[in-house]
Amino acid sequence: SEGIAAAFKASLTHVNVNYRYIEHELIYLLDNSDATVVMYHSEFEPFIEHIHEQLPKVKQWIEVEEGHTHSESEDSFYEELVGLGDGSPVDVKHSADDLLFLYTGGTTGMPKGVMWRHDDLFKVQGTGGSPLLGISPCADLEELLERLSTQSAPVNLPLPPIMHGTGLLSAVGAMSSGGTCVTLPSRSFEPELALANIDAHKVTSVTIVGDAFARPLLDSLNDNPQKYDISSIYAISSSGVMWTRDIKAGLLKHNVNMLLIDKFSSSEAIGLGTSIMTSDEDIDVAKFALGPACKVFNEAGIELHPGADEPG
């Protein structure tokens, strides 16, 4: 999260990297994105050291240490670099054309980089508003700042890894709304740790990927009644895989005021559709209400409207 915020503040292009990529995939992605600075965790140091010479475009490698223990790497160390700065604003000119690269998982071949303009990304995420909550978008940055000064800032907990588009964009959404992104120290998903942090930080929104996250959360809540207070949550959002009705209903028993939101999106297109379940509005199977940016076209490029007999 610190790296993302720093990149945005300095008008640098952030690139997400899947830590499960093998050597040829990683070399391809870093070369394809024209990466010049690479931040990596110390556990990957032997692997990173092996690919240095194959990536001549990279001018600086920054190792994020495990605790205060330095490896034998000759690369720069993150905490040392942070200590050299004074925290003053960076003298750069920001532009609506600043970019975020969002690389897909490579399910259709090698990873593909989606180039999101900051202005487009901010607008597609609601421009400081929320159609789901009936909050109108802001006309400009000044209106957004005024609105943020009079309302509570969101506190988001993204449970999928931030290298994943779902986790990354939920973190960016929270930060661009003047809010907080809560991250967990564990290397894998631990539902009890997630619930403890929801309670401790009064998290207002949680991001998951279907039943793979929702079921363990529900099991932990059922197994530990009264241990975790999740009343601060107003929304749990999911994208990517199935989130079943029974799991949703079980979660709502622990907080009847939550919105449980299925989102229909992709790396290239955000906000195509949503489906919402609440304690007052039960649903058997998620049916998505199309977002304003969702269009369907036939083979001739003619837009099709809901109810059309023709496939698109």
Residue ranges and their predicted role:
Residues 5-11, 32, 164, 175-176:
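Short hydrophobic alpha-helices that are characteristic scaffold elements of the AMP-binding
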Residues 9-82:
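Structural core segment of the AMP-binding/adenylate-forming
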Residues 34-36, 53-67, 88, 150, ...:
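Conserved helix-loop-beta element of the AMP-binding
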Residues 79, 106, 176-179, 203-208, ...:
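Gly/Ser/Thr-rich phosphate-binding loop
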Residues 85-103, 109-110, 146-156:
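Conserved pre-ATP/AMP-binding loop-to-beta segment of ANL
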Residues 99-137:
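Conserved AMP-binding A3 loop
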Residues 123-159, 163-205, 220:
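Conserved AMP-binding/adenylation subdomain of ANL enzymes
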Residues 295-312:
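Conserved beta-loop-beta connector loops within the AMP-binding
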